[in-house]
Amino acid sequence: AGSKSRSRSRSRSRSKSPAKSASPKSAASPRASR
């Protein structure tokens, strides 16, 4: 569970960045995109 919690925290921080769209991880994660 700790690993998932960190992943969400990173996703949020990247979501604010405009590079999130260029990130392949964001596209693979539909939850982070939303």
Swiss-Prot record:
Residues 1-17 have a biased composition (Basic residues). The keyword DNA-binding applies. GO terms for cellular component: nucleus. GO terms for molecular function: DNA binding. Residues 18-34 have a biased composition (Low complexity). It is found in: Nucleus. Sequence repeats lie at residues 3-4, 5-6, 7-8, 9-10, 11-12, 13-14, 15-16. The keyword Repeat applies. Residues 1-34 are annotated as: Disordered. Residues 3-16 are annotated as: 7 X 2 AA tandem repeats of S-[KR]. This is Sperm protein EM1. It comes from Ensis minor (Razor shell).
